[in-house]
A protein has these predicted regions:
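WD40/WD-repeat beta-propeller blade N-cap
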Residues: 1-8, 47-54, 92-99, 105-106, ...
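WD40/WD-repeat beta-propeller blade-loop signature
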Residues: 7-9, 18-21, 43, 53, ...
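WD40-repeat beta-propellers
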Residues: 11, 31-36, 57, 77-82, ...
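Loop/turn segments within WD40 beta-propeller blades
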Residues: 12-19, 58-65, 84-85, 103-126, ...
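Conserved strand-to-loop turn within each blade of WD40 beta-propeller repeats
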Residues: 24-28, 70-74, 131-136, 180-185, ...
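Short loop/turn segments immediately following beta-strands, especially the blade-tip
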Residues: 35-39, 82-84, 142-148, 191-200, ...
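Loop/turn-rich, solvent-exposed surfaces of beta-rich toroidal or solenoidal domains
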Residues: 161-194
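C-terminal interaction modules of eukaryotic adaptor/scaffold proteins
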Residues: 203-255
Length: 255
């Protein structure tokens, strides 16, 4: 087994339709991609273009393909694509002070799952993700097939300290939800209606949840209606949207 030269911060599984593929990222600035073959794990790709710690990696939903996004302290985001047993990559600046997290959107736009589709070819699956940075901002990125690059479609501002984590809710129903966790001891839940242009920051509203400690991670349930929050107080709290649109803590798990 090959080894990283520093602490391993994150591991992430690709969708099983692409095989048994695992990615790892490290303080050493490298990303390894592994595949199980004949009962043995083999490193099939190494990405070395980041110049600082790779803090978080995330595979895209399977519909747009096999894409791995990585957030690095060097201020850049990379997207590695696995297609026809070959790898390609893109790397671009995202947050000048460092990128701490990345999270893919659902492959369907909000409302597509429940609305009637016109006859003909279905809409192309989305290749879109959110990043959180040490510049206190959340940024949204969308793949542009014309330029074959990722465009910054929106900047969400409101935190007053580093954004440690972002999580895009997997539900594509009637709204888009993004949760952001910050060193400012708050979580913001950003909401955009299905009918609105999510590339316009004014269409996003945020609900602020306040805590007594730094917040490290946020994670949505698979159904996208429960948010788990963990922070420096060694607690995990579960939050759910009420019928009135507020967010209530429904359970707290303590160490």
């Amino acid at each position: 087994m090959y080894r990283h030269d520093g602490a391993v911060w994150c591991v992430s599984w690709a969708h099983p339709k692409f095989g048994t593929i695992l990615a790892s990222s490290s303080y050493d600035g490298r990303i390894f991609i592994w595949r199980e073959q004949n009962g043995q794990w083999q490193r099939i790709y190494e990405f070395t273009l980041h110049t600082a710690s790779v803090n978080l990696i995330a595979w895209s939903p399977p519909e747009p393909g096999c894409h791995l996004a990585a957030a690095s302290s060097d201020g850049s985001v990379s997207v590695i694509t696995f297609l026809d047993n070959a790898f390609s990559h893109q790397i671009f600046p995202a947050h000048g002070l460092g990128v701490n997290s990345v999270s893919w959107s659902p492959s369907l736009a909000p409302g597509q799952l429940t609305s009637a589709q016109a006859p003909g070819s279905p809409p192309a699956p989305l290749r879109r993700f959110a990043t959180g940075g040490s510049d206190n901002q959340v940024k949204l990125w969308d793949y542009n097939p014309q330029t074959q690059s990722y465009d910054n479609m929106c900047v969400l501002s409101g935190h007053v300290d580093w954004v440690r984590d972002v999580a895009w809710s997997p539900t594509p129903l009637n709204k888009s939800y993004i949760a952001s966790a910050s060193q400012d001891k708050t979580v913001r839940i950003w909401t955009c209606p299905a009918s609105a242009d999510m590339g316009n920051a004014s269409n996003w509203t945020s609900t602020e949840l306040k805590f007594d400690a730094v917040i490290w991670r946020v994670s949505w349930s698979l159904s996208g209606n429960v948010l788990a929050v963990s922070g420096g107080d060694n607690r995990v709290s579960l939050w759910k949207e009420s019928l009135k649109g507020g967010w209530d803590c429904v359970k707290t798990i303590e160490e």
